[in-house]
Every structure is written in C-alpha cells, then in structure tokens.
C-alpha cells in the first residue's frame, strides 16, 4: 500500500505532494513501482494534530445531509469540504489513468469516505478505528467497501498525556476485538475488514517495539493485518545518535527492518512511503519465511 499525502503538513513528506498534479503523478509512480494499492489522504494525523470528533447528537442531525456541517470542529482541523477538495480530484485522476487501480481513502470522516468511494476508492482506511465519527460504521456498511480499522489511543493532541499500560498488546487485542465485533453487529461484513495495530498512534516509543514483535498474537482475531511503520518516530528513535532521533527522510533502512519483522509475524499488507524498497524487502522476506 503506497502512501499519497495530499497535505501541507504530514510528518513524512511535509507537503511535497500537496499540489494535486504532483499527488497524481506520485500515486501513478507508486503503482508503477509495484504497489498493489495507493492510500490517498487529505488530513494529517501526526502527533499534536487537531482532529474533529463528532458527538452522536451532531451525527443524528447531519447524517441525512449530502455533506456534513463543519461547525463542530476544531479550528485547526481540516473541514470536510477542504478535505474533499484535496482528495477527490486525485482519486478521479488516478482512476482515469489506471481504471483497475485499487484506491484507498485515508479518512475518519464518514462524509469524506462516502464521496471518495463514489469517486472510485474501494477501501476506507480510518485511523480512529471508526470511533471519531459515529456515522462511519453505518456508512461503511452501506458502501460495502473494504475497511481498515486502525487502533488508536486517544486523539493526537492527547498522546503525550496518555496513561501507560502494563501490557499494551493485551489492550490493543481486546479493543480491536470489541471494535470489530461492534462493526460487524452494525452491518460491516467480516470479510471486508482489515486490522491495523496502529503503530505510533497513541503509543510511546517503547510500546511500539513489542507491539510489532508480538503482531502474530493478533491472528487469533481472524482478520487480515496491516502494518504501517514507514518513517515513524519510533524508527527514528531506534536509530538515534548523540541524543538526536534520525530525521524523517533518513529512516528508510530502519523502516525496512521493521517491515521485515511485520512480514515475519504474518502481516498481509505493508503501508509504506517507499514502495520499491519495501516491495523488494517483502519479496525477500517471503523467500526466507
């Protein structure tokens, strides 16, 4: 899964593909490099990012509208119209250039998910685990699309203050189980769900390493697994020198090592910014398995 950030402030590329034409070019390049799918996102969820979380009352008022209101969001969050303006032209252009391309939309907003799938996306990748927008589960059930449920603890602006967990894998496994069962009960087909343990999402540096090493414990939930370690902070911390984390743009080899562990533990999908390198790594890891 190749990453395409149509944002001005993502931690990994800092707006390199905020221009829509460049984003389309990059998506097509990743597909040409061998990506099975591209994940297109229009809002950063980097640490300290502000995001919109709707109450169920607000959703009840908005769910029948064509495009949900933006009055409840943080001033720093990306509005639905703005997010749609970023991603829809890219999705449409990729679909025109490569009609058979598999496209994922990276969003936690049900309104964006619906419009993106109507424009040609086949998968919704929700970093909130379908938790931030109460309309998301109903929307995904209606759309009958693929759904990536990501484990996240709290919101990005809360991560620094989260209480530590003695055994975070047990928490992640229990919550993923609860969230998937709720999603299935509310209408999402089991065979459309992929689970992501959410490396870096509400976990501190020390917690990410055992989560990845123990990834195989999630197989008991009986869903395909996605791993997204690409360029993340815990990679930079592992490669730190003289007290300074490795810069984002120089984390490739650490990323590949993390992805190799993920593959060895049974990951089905690798979400990456560096498709060619990750694909070579995956092929070699498969040969040695």
Range-by-range predicted roles:
Residues 1-2, 29-42:
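N-terminal glycine-rich anion-binding loops that anchor highly charged ligand groups
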Residues 199:
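Acidic helix/loop microenvironments that form the catalytic cleft of cell-wall polysaccharide enzymes
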Residues 56-58:
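Charged/polar low-complexity intrinsically disordered segments
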